[in-house]
A protein has these predicted regions:
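Pyridoxal 5′-phosphate
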Residues: 1-412
Length: 412
């Protein structure tokens, strides 16, 4: 693995305490990173440090603890902005995660700027979080929902043509599919969408911990992501939005902290990002997210991407050799993130996942919050192995061996 020799896997794995535990007496092989990633010690320590040393509310107090908490909280905003290439930390809105970030755009931007008869263009490979909010909005405002189909190879089928033909007001799509692993051509699609007069939202949940993200270069208008899928805590995440768009959007929720003035009859609101952050925020998780960004930056996103591409090549080779195993999505690691959804003929994914768990291997089974995609693939469910830069090729060998054991146990 010449490209990835800058990754010290022994040191990296030592940074993640949970990787050293056993499951059913077997070493843990954690291949469920698309659901949530594990946390390095530095993230755990950052959260503990907040609660032990400077636990206080942010923005409101003038005492030392409040000032320290505010500095750490806002420091995370600055780190995130730099990490994803935002021009200004004020373009980063903290949310509960990708789901809330997309809902924020739907309820704020969508309610204000979309009108009856307008079209929203999505794709068949979307997570439910980038589908259901638009269904709600379309039902409320009588909008048209259209979908870019997916080819048998797992790529979007002529999305540029769909954009030019349908002239949507919003194009919203996933950066990396959580089922197919497909890395979509964000920069090109954003360019075509803007030429057609559309605003562009990208679901980056499966991208930010796996490949370099630069929102300025990508050219989108919104980019949503979750902390817990980038080595950070659960309960937080973010939305990046162009400053000029955020400025025109109304608040999403009402309450404390997001206001300038309040009278009995009306209120005025702060500028972005604060007008979108009502109430006491998830302070400890945000501070932990900042520590996660520090950790990812120290490893290097280019290094992580190179390693995961080579890791995927190894995984493809080994899994393809398993009789009866079907992999869904692109077979080229350059076009794919660290996700492999698959089925083994004659074995239900839930049964397979159960046997794998007994062998210490954690995978996901089901529809992975992507029912329409599974319907399109003509399957009810799939097993999914999803990877991170702390996984090793020897763990792929364990997975393949465990699949073989499942076939014997289930007499396939």
């Amino acid at each position: 693995m010449s490209k990835s020799n800058s990754l010290d896997l022994k040191k990296i794995r030592a940074d993640f305490p949970i990787l050293h535990r056993k499951v059913h007496g077997k070493p843990l092989v954690y291949f469920d990173n698309a659901a949530t990633t594990q946390k390095p010690r530095s993230v755990i320590n950052a959260i503990s440090d907040y609660y032990e040393r400077y636990n206080a509310n942010v923005h409101r107090g003038i005492h030392l603890l409040a000032e320290e908490a505010t500095a750490a909280y806002e420091g995370s905003r600055g780190k995130l902005a730099k990490f994803i290439g935002a021009r200004n930390p004020a373009e980063i809105i903290f949310t509960r995660g990708t789901t809330e970030a997309i809902n924020l755009v739907a309820y704020s931007w969508g309610e204000k700027f979309l009108k009856e008869g307008d079209t929203i263009l999505l794709t068949l490979m979307e997570h439910h979080s980038n589908l259901v909010p638009w269904q709600f909005l379309a039902q409320r405002k009588k909008l048209n929902l259209e979908f870019v189909p997916v080819t048998a190879a797992g790529y979007l089928e002529d999305p540029e043509g769909a954009i030019r033909q349908l002239r949507p007001k919003l194009v919203s799509f996933v950066h990396v599919s959580n089922v197919l692993g497909t890395v979509n051509p964000v920069k090109n699609l954003a360019k075509v969408a803007h030429e057609a007069g559309a605003t562009v939202l990208v679901d980056g949940a499966q991208a930010v911990a796996h490949l370099p993200v630069d929102v300025a270069s990508l050219g989108c208008d919104f980019y949503a992501f979750s902390s817990h899928k980038m080595m950070g805590p659960t309960g937080t995440g973010g939305l990046w939005g162009r400053a000029e768009i955020l400025e025109r959007m109304p608040p999403f929720l009402g309450g404390g902290e997001m206001i300038k003035e309040v009278s009995l009859r009306e209120s005025s609101f702060k500028d972005a990002p604060y007008k979108f952050e009502a109430g006491t925020p998830s302070i400890a998780p945000v501070i932990g997210l900042g520590a996660a960004v520090d950790y990812l930056s120290s490893v290097g996103m280019e290094n992580i991407r190179h390693y995961e591409e080579e890791f995927l090549e190894y995984a493809f080779e080994k899994l393809a050799a398993v009789p009866g195993l079907t992999i869904y999505g692109p077979q080229n690691s350059e076009d794919r993130g660290g996700v492999i959804a698959f089925n083994v003929a004659g074995i239900h994914p839930h049964d397979l996942a159960t046997v794998l768990d007994q062998e210490g291997v954690a995978v996901r089974s089901g529809n992975h919050c992507a029912m329409p995609l599974h319907t399109h693939l003509k399957i009810n469910a799939s097993a999914r192995a999803s990877f991170a830069f702390y996984n090793t090729t020897s763990e792929i060998d364990v997975l393949v061996e465990a699949i073989g054991k499942a076939k014997k146990i289930l007499k396939v």
